[in-house]
Amino acid sequence: MHDDVDVSGLPEGITPLGNQIYAIDTMLAGYPGVVSAYLIRTERPCIVEVGTAGSAPVLRDAVIRLGLAPEDLATIVVTHIHLDHAGGTGDMAALFPNAEIVVHERGARHLADPSRLMASAKMVWGDRLETLFGQMHPTEAARIRSVAETGEVDLGAGRKLVSHYAPGHAKHHMGLVDTGTGDLYVGDALGVYNPLTGDLRPATPPPDFDMDACLRTLGLFRDIGAQRLMFSHFGAHDTVTETIDRAEDELRLWVETVRDSRDTGGDLDHAIAMVRDKVVSRYKPLPADASAGTVAVLDTLSGPEANVSGIMHWLDKLAQEQAEAKRKAEEERA
């Protein structure tokens, strides 16, 4: 049942990628080109990333279009629990009754009880929360399997997804390697790739962004030697080494620009303005026919406001840690 898909006439939001893998546009907030989910249609079918609550019916319809019944899905994996990646987990669990839900151990409790996550999101997004993400519903705890530094998902016939803890963007983030293809599912660890322009921007939101952890994760991803990078934002890319190098270069440029602003006494607004002037201005202009909604959502998720806020938060935390270390050293010398 897993090698008989007629790929002719597939809907625009479903893209065959070979090796029984299909990218599915989750249509976040109704807009295309924002979040990619992936169906691995093997003996034990698996979906990587679920998008928001509003994305669950989109994924159900795609799975059925690709010749599977909802009962066939064996596993649902989320790279991390941010709402654009995992907000629909509870809805997906209801639609796919036999699927095990796999998440990093630091995020597992929030899938079972998303009340704290939703309260935090409400503080960040305000009135935009419902429009962008909808409500995250609880997932039955017995169906959740958490993984730590590494873990495995059985895809059948000896093929597996191997998880690797990949913090920096979030403390509950992991990457996933398909042992049958060498594909690496990167979540937000490399940032946001804009298919409209080819630009790659970092994703550095508060409160978890950590530059040092990001760089370690990029090093881990280099060492994996992947054949292809599967972005959650957005799509598959086979220029692996070049793309990881670009991700690091962009990350360093954003952080250095914000640091320069902060070191000269600039506040958040000043840092955002500097990033727009010195960094964002380098990116290619959007095509004239680009969806205004897609552009707005991408800018909301990984634009200067969110990214600079996360970088400033990390720099402030770093300064506090350095000051505390200095104070303790002086006390020891006294």
Task: Give the residues covered by each predicted segment.
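Active-site metal-binding loops of divalent metal-dependent hydrolases
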Residues: 50-52, 81, 106-107, 169-170, ...
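C-terminal regulatory/interaction regions
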Residues: 2, 260-334
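Conserved beta-strand hairpin/beta-sheet module of binuclear metal-dependent hydrolase folds
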Residues: 7-66, 70, 176-186
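Core dinuclear metal-dependent hydrolase active-site scaffold
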Residues: 39, 150-178, 183
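Metal-dependent catalytic neighborhoods of phosphoester/phosphodiester hydrolases
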Residues: 86-96
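Divalent-metal (often Zn2+) His-rich catalytic cores of metallo-beta-lactamase-fold enzymes
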Residues: 215-269
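Metallo-beta-lactamase
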Residues: 2-5, 72-84, 111-164, 215-218
